[in-house]
């Protein structure tokens, strides 16, 4: 090779290597940008996730406080002597003033004696025993 050609050849090799270096540097820069963008997106996703969790916990805490306040109000009403939501009816003679007064008293009176209750219980026991006697014996005898 001639010296001019050789120098031209060297120059072309140098520029090619420079171009390759420039290309590789540019690809590295682009890759860095892409990685940085991906990392930023990932960080944004993580931040939004933690913000969501934080808002959920705050809402849950507020709801618990509201329920505690409401139950405290109900407890104060029932324990404080105020009237609660339960109404116990109390009848007065005036409530029945428009009813007919010429009615006869009922023929049967309910007594508070336990004799009748014991008789009923005895009759029930007897009927149960009869039913047991009529039933099949499923116990195996050896």
UniProtKB/Swiss-Prot annotation:
Any GO CC annotation of this UniProt entry: nucleus
Places the protein is found: Nucleus
GO BP term, pick one: regulation of systemic acquired resistance
One Pfam family recorded for the sequence: NPR1_interact
Compositionally biased region (Basic and acidic residues): 111-121
Region annotation (Disordered) ranges: 63-86, 108-142
Chain residue ranges for the region called Involved in NPR1/NIM1 interaction: 47-53
Alphabetical UniProt keywords: Coiled coil, Nucleus
Summary of subunit composition and partner proteins: Interacts with NPR1 C-terminal region.
Family, similarity comment: Belongs to the NPR1-interactor family.
PANTHER family linked: PROTEIN NEGATIVE REGULATOR OF RESISTANCE (PTHR33669), PROTEIN NIM1-INTERACTING 1 (PTHR33669:SF1)
The protein's name in its UniProt record: Protein NIM1-INTERACTING 1
Organism listed in the record: Arabidopsis thaliana (Mouse-ear cress)
Lineage of the organism: Eukaryota, Viridiplantae, Streptophyta, Embryophyta, Tracheophyta
Encoding gene per record: NIMIN-1
């Amino acid at each position: 090779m001639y010296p001019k050609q050789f120098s031209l050849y060297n120059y072309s090799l140098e520029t090619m290597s420079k171009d390759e270096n420039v290309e590789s540097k540019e690809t590295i820069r682009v890759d860095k940008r892409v990685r940085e963008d991906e990392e930023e997106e990932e960080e944004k996703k993580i931040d939004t996730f933690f913000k969501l969790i934080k808002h959920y916990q705050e809402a849950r805490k507020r709801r618990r406080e509201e329920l505690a306040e409401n139950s405290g109000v109900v407890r104060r009403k029932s324990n404080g002597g105020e009237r609660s939501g339960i109404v116990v009816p109390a009848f007065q003679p005036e409530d029945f003033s428009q009813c007919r007064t010429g009615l006869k008293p009922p023929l049967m009176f309910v007594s508070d004696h336990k004799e009748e209750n014991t008789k009923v219980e005895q009759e029930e026991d007897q009927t149960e025993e009869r039913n047991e006697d009529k039933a099949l014996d499923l116990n195996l005898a050896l």
